[in-house]
C-alpha cells in the first residue's frame, strides 16, 4: 500500500517539473564560456593598459620644451634667406639658387642682393627678383663671368667699377629695372639690354659705347631718351630705340656727313617707332644704311 502511494505521488509531481527555457540555457553557456576565459581576458587587458601607460610615459619623457632663446634662434634661421657674405669665402654655397656646371640660376626667389657665387661661375640668371643695387664686391672674385641677366628687378643704382673686372663678360641684361643712367660697360660686350628703364640721354656718357668694338645687339627701347646715343660702334647689327622721346637726329647719327661714300653695311635693323621724330624729314641721316629704320616717315 505504501509503495502504491509513493508511486502516485511521483506521477503527480513529474508534470510540474519543466526544463529551463532556451534563453536561460544559453545564458548559462555564455556565462560558463566567460568564466573559463575570464583570467585570460583580465591578463590581456592588464597588459594593454601597462603598454599604453608605458608608451605615454616614454612620450612624456622625450618631450623637450624649448626655451625662449631656442625659439628665437629657430625663428631667425627660418626667416634668413642667405647667410652674410664673407670676404674670404672661397666656395660659397648656392642656397636659394641652382648651380650647374658654371651656370647659376636664381630666378624668382625674391632675393634683394646678388647672392654669393662660386668662383667658377660663368653665367648668372637672377631674373625677376627684388635686387635694388649692384656693387663692385658682387663680382670682384668672379672673373670668368660671361653672361649676367638681371631682367625684372628693382635696380636703380649700379656702383662705379661694378663690371670693371669682368673682362670676359659678353652679355649683360638690365632690362625692366629702375635705372636712370648707364654704368661703365665692360669692353667685350656683344649684347647689352637696358630696355624698359627710365634712362634719359643725360644718363648716357658721350663715349659709353665708343670702345665696345664687339657690341652687336643694343636694346634701349622703352626709356626716356631724347636723342640717339653718340659714337655707336661699327660692330652693331641691331639697334632698338623705339618708344622713347627722340625728336630729331643728325646726319652723323648713323652716317658720316663728311664722307658720302661711307656705307654702314653691318646694321640690319634700327627701330625708331613710337618716338615723336618724323623720319621723312631727315633723309640724309640714312644715306649710308642698306635698310631704312623702322618708324614714322610722315
Curated annotation (Swiss-Prot):
Residues spanning the signal sequence: 1-20
Pfam families according to UniProt: LRR_8
Disulfide bonds: 255-288
GO molecular function: growth factor activity
Keywords: Disulfide bond, Extracellular matrix, Glycoprotein, Growth factor, Leucine-rich repeat, Proteoglycan, Repeat, Secreted, Signal
TM annotation in the entry: none
GO BP: any one term: bone development
Predominant subcellular localization, coarse grouping: secreted
GO cellular component: extracellular matrix; extracellular space
InterPro entries reported in the protein's UniProt record: Leu-rich_rpt (IPR001611), Leu-rich_rpt_typical-subtyp (IPR003591), LRR_dom_sf (IPR032675), Mimecan/Epiphycan/Opticin (IPR043547)
Similarity comment: family membership: Belongs to the small leucine-rich proteoglycan (SLRP) family. SLRP class III subfamily.
Name of this protein: Mimecan
Species name: Pongo abelii (Sumatran orangutan)
Amino acid at each position: 500500500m505504501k509503495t502504491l502511494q509513493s508511486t502516485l505521488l511521483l506521477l503527480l509531481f513529474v508534470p510540474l517539473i519543466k526544463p529551463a527555457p532556451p534563453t536561460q540555457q544559453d545564458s548559462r553557456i555564455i556565462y560558463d564560456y566567460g568564466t573559463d576565459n575570464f583570467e585570460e581576458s583580465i591578463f590581456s587587458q592588464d597588459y594593454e593598459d601597462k603598454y599604453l601607460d608605458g608608451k605615454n610615459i616614454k612620450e612624456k619623457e622625450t618631450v623637450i620644451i624649448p626655451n625662449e632663446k631656442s625659439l628665437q634662434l629657430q625663428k631667425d634661421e627660418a626667416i634668413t634667406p642667405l647667410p652674410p657674405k664673407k670676404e674670404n669665402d672661397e666656395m660659397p654655397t648656392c642656397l636659394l639658387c641652382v648651380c650647374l656646371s658654371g651656370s647659376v640660376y636664381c630666378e624668382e626667389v625674391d632675393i634683394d642682393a646678388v647672392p654669393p657665387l662660386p668662383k667658377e661661375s660663368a653665367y648668372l640668371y637672377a631674373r625677376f627678383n627684388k635686387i635694388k643695387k649692384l656693387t663692385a664686391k658682387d663680382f670682384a672674385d668672379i672673373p670668368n663671368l660671361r653672361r649676367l641677366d638681371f631682367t625684372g628687378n628693382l635696380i636703380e643704382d649700379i656702383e662705379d667699377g661694378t663690371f670693371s673686372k669682368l673682362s670676359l663678360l659678353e652679355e649683360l641684361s638690365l632690362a625692366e629695372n629702375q635705372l636712370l643712367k648707364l654704368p661703365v660697360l665692360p669692353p667685350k660686350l656683344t649684347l647689352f639690354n637696358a630696355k624698359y628703364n627710365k634712362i634719359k640721354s643725360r644718363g648716357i656718357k658721350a663715349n659709353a659705347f665708343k670702345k665696345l668694338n664687339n657690341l652687336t645687339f643694343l636694346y634701349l627701347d622703352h626709356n626716356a631718351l631724347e636723342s640717339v646715343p653718340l659714337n655707336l660702334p661699327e660692330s652693331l647689327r641691331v639697334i632698338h630705340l623705339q618708344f622713347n622721346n627722340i625728336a630729331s637726329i643728325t646726319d652723323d647719327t648713323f652716317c658720316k656727313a663728311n664722307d658720302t661714300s661711307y656705307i654702314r653695311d653691318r646694321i640690319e635693323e634700327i627701330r625708331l617707332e613710337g618716338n615723336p621724330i618724323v623720319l621723312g624729314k631727315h633723309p640724309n641721316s640714312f644715306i649710308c644704311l642698306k635698310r631704312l629704320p623702322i618708324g614714322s616717315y610722315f
